[in-house]
């Protein structure tokens, strides 16, 4: 098959990660259109074919070759034991740009204080294999039952404890649960089928995708600033800029003035711009950054 007719099959996570994943791909330059109730998003790239599927199943289907590449959590790779290529860490989740945690949680008034107190108890969770390995590593024997959902409501009547994923802990607190320990920290990963990874055309396509996705993540929460300043104020201005990289400085046609360009955290801009103005900067211009490639 000629490269002009080749297609890379991409698995996208359906559910809690779907919206943030589609947004991330958009920032990376891949624009999907998802129709209501459809599992087959369209995309502005003739070399990509996408399907929405639950993250829990993604690693299994990538291993089988149903997908060349997909996005799922480190947790589900471990849980399923899938033999796949882990191409890139993409640290984002449903509501933030940080990892999630699988935690052992119990009712607030539970006497359970450590994992050792779980001996002979009942635990409900979606990650049965991860939980069993955790208990085994701590020398604890307990019954681990698969939970089909609404895991937070099961203690104390249906389970003594749960192992549940959390991003902020708010859902656990709302259900009057207390975190005992963190079992696993997980983030989204771009994974590939081993045979697909060995295919030069597919590997190049996957690596390019990983580069652009990582660039979009790197740009989150950052903006660019451009400004002009008298050369006499350059030292003072560069000293006050909390730059992620050294600012780019260019001499203007008027040899007593310079142009500066720098990348900073967006949350620092509201304090920084007034200080730059006081220091002598002019024509200060803020712009969005979609991708930041290291």
From Swiss-Prot:
Example GO biological process: L-histidine biosynthetic process
Keyword Kinase carried by entry: no
Record has Cell membrane as a keyword: no
Pathway terms, separated by semicolons: Amino-acid biosynthesis; L-histidine biosynthesis; L-histidine from 5-phospho-alpha-D-ribose 1-diphosphate: step 1/9
Matching Pfam families: HisG, HisG_C
Localisation: Cytoplasm
Record CDD domains: PBP2_HisGL3 (cd13593)
The organism's place on the tree of life at top rank: Bacteria
Single GO term (MF): ATP phosphoribosyltransferase activity
InterPro entries: ATP-PRT_HisG_long (IPR020621), ATP_PRibTrfase_cat (IPR013820), ATP_PRibTrfase_HisG (IPR001348), HisG_C (IPR013115), N-reg_PII-like_a/b (IPR011322), N-reg_PII/ATP_PRibTrfase_C (IPR015867)
EC number: 2.4.2.17
Catalytic activity: 1-(5-phospho-beta-D-ribosyl)-ATP + diphosphate = 5-phospho-alpha-D-ribose 1-diphosphate + ATP
Cofactor(s) in the UniProt record: Mg(2+)
SUPFAM superfamilies recorded: GlnB-like (SSF54913), Periplasmic binding protein-like II (SSF53850)
Description of activity control: Feedback inhibited by histidine.
Keywords: Amino-acid biosynthesis, ATP-binding, Cytoplasm, Glycosyltransferase, Histidine biosynthesis, Magnesium, Metal-binding, Nucleotide-binding, Transferase
Enzyme category, top tier: transferase
Gene3D superfamilies: 3.30.70.120, Periplasmic binding protein-like II
Role summary: Catalyzes the condensation of ATP and 5-phosphoribose 1-diphosphate to form N'-(5'-phosphoribosyl)-ATP (PR-ATP). Has a crucial role in the pathway because the rate of histidine biosynthesis seems to be controlled primarily by regulation of HisG enzymatic activity.
Cross-referenced NCBIfam families: hisG, HisG_C-term
Family classification: Belongs to the ATP phosphoribosyltransferase family. Long subfamily.
Protein name as catalogued: ATP phosphoribosyltransferase
Organism per entry: Chlorobium phaeovibrioides (strain DSM 265 / 1930)
